[in-house]
């Protein structure tokens, strides 16, 4: 039995845990996190039980026993050896990052263009509606992209697409060897170009800026996760920055600075070139992706003193805050002096026993709530604001459209499953995806579907969609956990 347990711990992967906001941490993960301390306590206990005086007598007795029980002794040595090896792997986990780049050293990064989808939500404003974004107008069969690198991977990260390259992170490994991988693949044929291994699984999405890739690592139970900066052309390591928590947040890069949430370690602002710390706002638990408006940083908190917080871009000081009754999970979108945040109970894995959700609109001039629209379950998505309309998804299985000025209802679309992906908008269409793999193009005005396709038709009935779609050049790119990366539409088919 002991051998069986040891083998399972060594070779069976962790049950998929969407340990993102709020905290989801299984008993086994808790035990693993405490393993170094437990080993120390065990060592002290052994030392207390066995006095120095009795060691010689016991060693002699052990020799006699081992000679009489050779088979059992071998098994015992294997079990102990396995535990020791696993512990070494666990404690040495911080040393695993490294690149496997295939491009030539010095290969140029793809230039950013007007139609680039360079970060989560398409641009640093988290709009979901970049200026020249174009998505597919008609349905087509989803094509699996990057099978060699991404097939059946855990994909919580949303892709970025710049030029003919797609960037995304995946998670994998087993209980004692879980890790993350940052990928760059050819967006046309899925050929792997380079990958970079991180010590922990990740939920953060890649940001392309200045020829570099910025991305965080870690889920809720990690306490020393890092933000990485890589060369976008080669995948070579440039610098990293270690926090005292997890970096599920997708960073924002603006004016030579990288700003990101680090869970209960607050918000950091780093120099984008060197990774040097500029400021650190402590005392906040931030998992969403910050937005920068003029000389301020907008974030929300889901634990502790829940609410909306506005920080000074230069110093990180809290300028003002607006308390909320429920956790703020949806990354803010800003337009015309108003910021829109998703609120609620529940998380990416399940609904809360007492579900609640809402979209909150905050007037940045008056520092007060402009309006709030309640839903039947949590709003974990970032809204897309286009003109006088705001679009967002909810765990209550619906995509909503509201008047952005006063929050009045326009329409809602029944997606048939929780909507955990943030919508993208282009050319009169709202693109959305449900957790069970339906991808739909919804008419912005009527709320009626123009087309629907199902990722499960590709042969992955158990897939889950947590990541958000990226649109560019008449195509839609989206990842599904336990499946892979898919592309819908032909280039230029708008």
Model segments located where?
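Sec-dependent N-terminal signal peptides
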Residues: 2-5, 68-80
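Membrane-embedded alpha-helical segments of integral membrane proteins
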Residues: 6-57
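Hydrophobic alpha-helical membrane-insertion segments, chiefly the h-region
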Residues: 12-15, 81-91
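Aromatic (tryptophan-biased) beta-strands that constitute blades/sheets of beta-rich domains
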Residues: 70-72, 76, 89-157, 167-169, ...
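Repeat-blade elements of multi-bladed beta-propeller folds
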Residues: 90-92, 114-124, 152-182, 200-228, ...
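Glycine-rich phosphate/oxyanion-binding loops and their immediately adjacent helices
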Residues: 169, 188, 273, 314, ...
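Structural recognition of the beta-propeller blade-terminating site
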Residues: 186, 231, 271, 312, ...
């Amino acid at each position: 039995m002991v051998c069986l347990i040891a083998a399972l711990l060594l070779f069976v992967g962790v049950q998929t845990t969407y340990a993102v906001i709020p905290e989801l941490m299984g008993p086994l993960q808790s035990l693993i996190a405490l393993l170094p301390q437990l080993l120390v306590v065990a060592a002290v206990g052994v030392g207390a039980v066995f006095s120095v005086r009795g060691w010689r007598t016991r060693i002699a007795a052990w020799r006699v026993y081992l000679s009489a029980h050779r088979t059992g002794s071998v098994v015992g040595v294997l079990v102990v050896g396995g535990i020791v090896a696993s512990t070494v792997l666990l404690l040495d986990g911080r040393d695993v990052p490294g690149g496997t780049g295939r491009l030539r050293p010095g290969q140029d990064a793809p230039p950013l263009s007007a139609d680039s989808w360079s970060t989560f939500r398409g641009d640093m404003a988290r709009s979901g509606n970049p200026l020249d974004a174009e998505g597919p107008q008609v349905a087509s069969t989803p094509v699996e992209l990057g099978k060699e690198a991404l097939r059946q991977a855990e994909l919580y990260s949303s892709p970025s697409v710049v030029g003919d390259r797609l960037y995304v992170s995946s998670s994998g490994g087993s209980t004692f060897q879980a890790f993350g991988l940052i990928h760059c693949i050819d967006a046309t044929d899925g050929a792997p170009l380079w990958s970079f291994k991180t010590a922990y699984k990740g939920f953060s999405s890649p940001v392309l800026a200045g020829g570099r890739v910025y991305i965080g690592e870690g889920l809720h139970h990690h306490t020393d996760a890092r933000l990485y900066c890589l060369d976008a052309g080669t995948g070579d390591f440039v610098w990293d920055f270690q926090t005292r928590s997890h970096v599920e947040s997708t960073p924002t890069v603006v004016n030579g600075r990288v700003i990101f949430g680090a869970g209960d370690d607050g918000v950091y602002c780093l120099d984008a070139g060197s990774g040097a710390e500029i400021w650190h706002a402590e005392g906040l638990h931030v998992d969403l992706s910050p937005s920068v408006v003029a000389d301020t940083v907008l974030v929300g908190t889901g634990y502790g003193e829940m609410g909306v917080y506005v920080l000074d871009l230069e110093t990180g000081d809290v300028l003002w805050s607006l308390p909320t009754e429920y956790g703020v999970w949806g990354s803010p979108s800003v337009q015309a002096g108003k910021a829109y945040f998703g609120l609620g109970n529940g998380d990416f894995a399940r609904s809360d026993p007492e579900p609640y959700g809402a979209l909150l609109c905050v007037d940045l001039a008056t520092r007060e709530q402009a309006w709030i629209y309640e839903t039947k379950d949590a709003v974990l998505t970032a809204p897309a604001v286009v003109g006088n309309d705001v679009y967002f998804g909810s765990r209550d299985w619906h995509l909503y459209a509201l008047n952005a000025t006063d929050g009045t209802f326009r329409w809602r679309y029944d997606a048939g499953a929780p909507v955990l992906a943030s919508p993208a908008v282009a050319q009169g269409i709202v693109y959305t995806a449900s957790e069970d793999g339906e991808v739909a193009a919804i008419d912005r005005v009527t709320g009626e579907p123009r087309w629907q396709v199902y990722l499960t038709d590709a042969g992955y009935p158990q897939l889950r969609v947590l990541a958000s779609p990226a649109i560019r050049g008449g195509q839609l790119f989206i990842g599904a956990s336990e499946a892979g990366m898919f592309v819908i539409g032909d280039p230029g088919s708008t």
